[in-house]
């Protein structure tokens, strides 16, 4: 009787441990970075002056739940690309960056449970920033880790 109970327990454990839940659907959809319904900023080829602020405005959406976003500004003095730019812009001559090349990189949270979020930030360009070509990069991640990237070429005068 003990052996039968032990054998039944092992079989039951094996059935539970090996069962799969095919009803679970993994979220593989990337979040969306859009200007739909808002006036987005910045856009490709936009020009800013040193000492001014960039008024960042974009809408993010996701099929399940947004997570967070990151904004990065880095120099494009070497004319590299990110493959997400909407249009090509007139570039200055290639050059080496100096210590005054502007660099910005900051993470921002999105309220829990959000499927849509209108993001806005004011980013001050230092008066001492090196003029030239820059990339403004937006990264949005949803709660399951899917990420969308959008990079725009901007110029600082």
For each feature predicted by the language model, list its residue ranges.
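Bacterial Sec-dependent N-terminal signal peptides
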Residues: 2-3, 9-39
